Amino acid sequence: MINSIRIGTRNSTLALIQTNLVIEQIKQIFPDINCEIVPIITSGDLIQNKPLYDIGGKALFLKEIEQALLDKKIDLAVHSLKDIPGKIPVELVIAAVLEREDPRDVLVCLNYQSIETLPQNAVIGSSAVRRKAFIKKIRPDLNIKVFRGNVDSRIKKLMTGEVDAIILSYAGLKRLNVFNQKYCHLIEYSKMLPCIGQGVIAVEIRKDDNAMFNICSQINHLPTFELIKPERAFLEYLDANCSTPIAAYAQYLDAYNIQIDFMLGNLDCTKIIFQTEITNIKTSKICGIKAAKMMLAQQ
C-alpha cells in the first residue's frame, strides 16, 4: 500500500490550485495517502519576454517536470492538458484527467463586451497564434500585442491601458476566482474554437508505475478522457507547435457519439480551414487523424 505521493507541478498560483484539485480527488478515494506537492520552476516560467513559438513552445512548461518524473524525483505530475504536446516521452503516459471545465475563451475588457464592438485598430493582448487567427478573421483591423505572464500580470497591463482588451481562458479565471461578469465576456465556440485540451487538468505518470496507474484509474473522469482522444490525435498527427494555429473541440451528442470541430491555419494566420466530424466514441481517435490528413491536403 502506498503511503505517500510526490506530486510535481509548476509553481504558479493556478498550477498549485489545479494540483490541489487533483489531491482532493485522490483524498476522496485514498484518505490515508499523504500527498506532497513538489513545486518545479520550468523554462517557460523563467523566459517571459519572448513568444512561446520563438523559444520552444508549450513543452517548456513541462520539460523540467517530466524530467523529474523520469528521474523518479516525483511520482506523478499535474499539468494543464493544453500545455502538453501531441508527443510526450515514450516512458510517460497521461493516466488521468479531471472533469473538463468550460473550455471557452474570455474577452476581458473594461469598456466593450465583444471583439466585434472594440474600436477601430484597438489593441488586444494575447500570445496564442490560435487566438490571433480567430481575431484576424473576426476583425482584421485589430492589433495584437504579444502578452505572456500570469493572469494577474496580464490583467494589470489591461488596467494600466497598455492594451484595450486581453483574451484568457474561462477555466483559468474561474479556478483563480477572478471571473468578473462585468469585465469578462465569454466567446462562443462558433467564433473562437478552444485550444486542444483547454479546461482539462491532466495527470502524467511513468508507464511502468502500476501503483500510480491504479490510483489514476480511480480518479480519471472517463467521459472527459474519451473526448480528448480525437483532439489529441489531431494534434499528434499534425505534430503542431506554438507557431501553428490549431484548434479542436469534442463534445457529446449522446452516450455513444461525439461531434468534433477542427481548425487549422497557416503560419501567418491568413488562411483558416474548418472541419466538423461526427463519430462513435470507439472510432474517435481515428477520426482525429483522418481530419488532420484531410485538412493538410487542403492547405
UniProtKB/Swiss-Prot annotation:
Its cofactor is dipyrromethane. GO terms for biological process: protoporphyrinogen IX biosynthetic process. The porphobilinogen subunits are added to the dipyrromethane group. Tetrapolymerization of the monopyrrole PBG into the hydroxymethylbilane pre-uroporphyrinogen in several discrete steps. Binds 1 dipyrromethane group covalently. It is an enzyme of class 2 (transferase). This is Porphobilinogen deaminase. Pathway: Porphyrin-containing compound metabolism; protoporphyrin-IX biosynthesis; coproporphyrinogen-III from 5-aminolevulinate: step 2/4. The gene is hemC. Belongs to the HMBS family. It catalyses: 4 porphobilinogen + H2O = hydroxymethylbilane + 4 NH4(+). NCBIfam families: hemC. Its EC number is 2.5.1.61. Pfam families: Porphobil_deam (PF01379), Porphobil_deamC (PF03900). GO terms for cellular component: cytoplasm. The modification S-(dipyrrolylmethanemethyl)cysteine is found at residue 242. Monomer. It comes from Rickettsia prowazekii (strain Madrid E). Keywords: Porphyrin biosynthesis, Transferase. GO terms for molecular function: hydroxymethylbilane synthase activity. InterPro entries: HemC, Porphobilin_deaminase_cofac_BS, Porphobilin_deaminase_N, Porphobilinogen_deaminase_C, Porphobilinogen_deaminase_C_sf. HAMAP family: Porphobil_deam.
